[in-house]
């Protein structure tokens, strides 16, 4: 039987930001590891974007070799404690596990998290190459690339636009899913390796790509994320009480705007509608519960079966009292005296599948309203063009797609301008999540290292 971690009481956790799940116990780890079949052709490894040697680290756990398990994971993943908590394992490694065909897959994520939390990265002997790499952004892609490039001996500097490091791991994912102590430990590991960190540096404003090159950086990896929110473009979006999920989560996670002592306090109303069905929508809704909204709705234009969020996130949201309104498409945000007073929706039904493979919502001509005083829009984000615009004034004209994302070689992550690479949410390939960003960081680091090696 699959082992499951103990969870914080669903009523208590509505009122705090403490982690919802505990680690598995050592006994549970041993029991879960014993279920692994040690397949000769492990599908789970193919399902992992960074190709962690999953059967090998689980075998080490079977043999009570915890430190060895940590070494195996860290051969390919810098962030086991992070990935064990936030990666969509049910759609990746665990989704490929043969045991899941007729029963329950191995709890790979929980095992990885346990190993990450209970082992430390060993010191690495660095042989300096004299080459310099600039990494723009300190999220998953940047941290991963920095680790690999530093191990190869290169002088690595990470430039972060905000005042704390971690990117979306810091400002986007709430601490009840990813404790800040976990993220801080990973950052400190990089610093101990000799990676340099510069905060409050907006590349394209504070410094340009050309200036970085002039400062002696031999290669640049752009992984600054996608920070521009996608809005609904409906009437009422300019009313007070309308937030993008990006703003709402950043204000709570990074600026602590929910606390009384905050210099920029968050206005908490009675009821909020969160528009969207992904993990960000779940994070926003569950955060809204914790900051004090009495009623929290998630409004989604399809049915529960089409929700793209992790199953665990959906379950936790329901347990915490979030109300789901399915087959509702926003039409208008209603207002009174400049503030949100409600929302109008069209009732939908499902038609034929669209390009995503999900059945397309079709309007019925019937309408409904919700009494809410706050709206949080969680419909995704797009790239900020500041780097491209700044570069263009210096004669660096990047190729981008129609949405503004960098066009890159999928294997090397190199942009249309030689020696400049891009990955993560600024040049997404596949679903946008932590582990895919890490995969992009590894590809970029490999290509950058090969280029720098060729200069010798």
Regions from the PLM with identified roles:
Residues 158, 162-193, 197, 285-332:
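Rossmann-like dinucleotide-binding cores of NAD(P)H-dependent redox enzymes
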Residues 132-157, 281-289:
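N-terminal Rossmann-like FAD-binding beta1-loop-alpha1 element of flavoenzymes
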Residues 426-455:
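A conserved FAD-binding loop/helix module that cradles the flavin
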Residues 238-269, 353-430:
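FAD-site-proximal beta/loop scaffold in flavoenzymes
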Residues 112-127, 185-205, 229-291, 400-411:
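Glycine-rich dinucleotide-binding loop and its adjacent helix/turn
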Residues 68, 127-128, 132-136, 184-234, ...:
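Feature captures the FAD/FMN-dependent oxidoreductase FAD-binding
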Residues 13-32, 53-85, 102-125, 252-253:
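Ferredoxin-type iron-sulfur electron-transfer modules in oxidoreductases and energy-metabolism complexes
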Residues 38-63, 82-115, 157, 161-164, ...:
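Iron-sulfur cluster-binding cysteine motifs and their immediate structural context
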């Amino acid at each position: 039987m699959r082992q499951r971690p103990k969870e914080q009481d669903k009523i208590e956790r509505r009122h705090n930001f403490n982690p919802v799940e505990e680690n598995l116990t050592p006994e549970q780890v041993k029991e879960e590891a014993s279920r692994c079949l040690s397949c000769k052709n492990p599908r789970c490894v193919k399902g992992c974007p960074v190709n962690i040697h999953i059967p090998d680290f689980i075998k080490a756990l079977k043999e009570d070799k915890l430190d060895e398990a940590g070494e195996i994971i860290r051969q390919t993943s810098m962030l086991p404690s992070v990935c064990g908590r936030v990666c969509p394992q049910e759609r990746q490694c665990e989704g490929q596990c043969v045991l899941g065909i007729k029963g329950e897959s191995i709890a790979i994520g929980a095992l990885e998290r346990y190993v990450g939390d209970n082992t430390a990265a060993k010191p690495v002997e660095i042989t300096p190459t004299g080459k310099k790499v600039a990494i723009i952004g300190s999220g998953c892609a940047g941290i991963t690339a920095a680790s690999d490039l530093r191990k190869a001996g290169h002088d690595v500097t990470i430039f972060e636009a905000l005042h704390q490091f971690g990117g979306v791991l810091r400002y986007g994912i709430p601490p009840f899913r990813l404790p800040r102590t976990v993220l801080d430990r990973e950052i400190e590991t990089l610093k101990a390796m000799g990676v340099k960190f510069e905060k409050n540096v907006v590349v394209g404003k504070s410094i340009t790509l050309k200036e970085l090159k002039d400062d002696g950086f031999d290669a640049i990896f752009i992984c600054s994320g996608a920070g521009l929110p996608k809005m609904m473009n409906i009437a009422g979006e300019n009313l007070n009480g309308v937030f993008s999920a990006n703003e709402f989560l950043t204000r709570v996670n990074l600026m602590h705007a929910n606390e009384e002592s905050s210099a920029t306090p968050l206005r908490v109303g009675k009821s909020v509608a969160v528009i969207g069905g992904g993990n960000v929508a779940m994070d926003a809704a569950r955060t809204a519960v914790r900051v004090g909204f009495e009623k929290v709705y998630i409004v989604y234009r399809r049915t529960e079966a089409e929700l793209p969020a992790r199953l665990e996130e959906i379950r936790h949201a329901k347990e915490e009292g979030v109300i789901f309104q399915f087959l509702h498409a926003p039409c208008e945000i209603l207002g009174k005296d400049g503030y949100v007073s409600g929302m109008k929706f069209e009732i939908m039904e499902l038609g034929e599948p669209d390009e995503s493979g999900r059945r397309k919502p079709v309007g019925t001509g019937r309408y409904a309203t919700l009494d809410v005083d706050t709206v949080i829009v969680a419909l995704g984000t797009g790239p900020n063009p500041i780097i491209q615009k700044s570069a263009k004034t210096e004669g660096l004209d990047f190729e981008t797609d129609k949405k503004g994302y960098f066009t890159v070689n999928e294997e090397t992550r190199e942009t249309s301008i030689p020696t400049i690479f891009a990955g993560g949410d600024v040049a997404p390939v596949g679903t946008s999540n932590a582990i895919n960003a890490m995969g992009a960081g590894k590809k970029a680091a490999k290509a950058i290292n090969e280029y720098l090696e060729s200069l010798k």
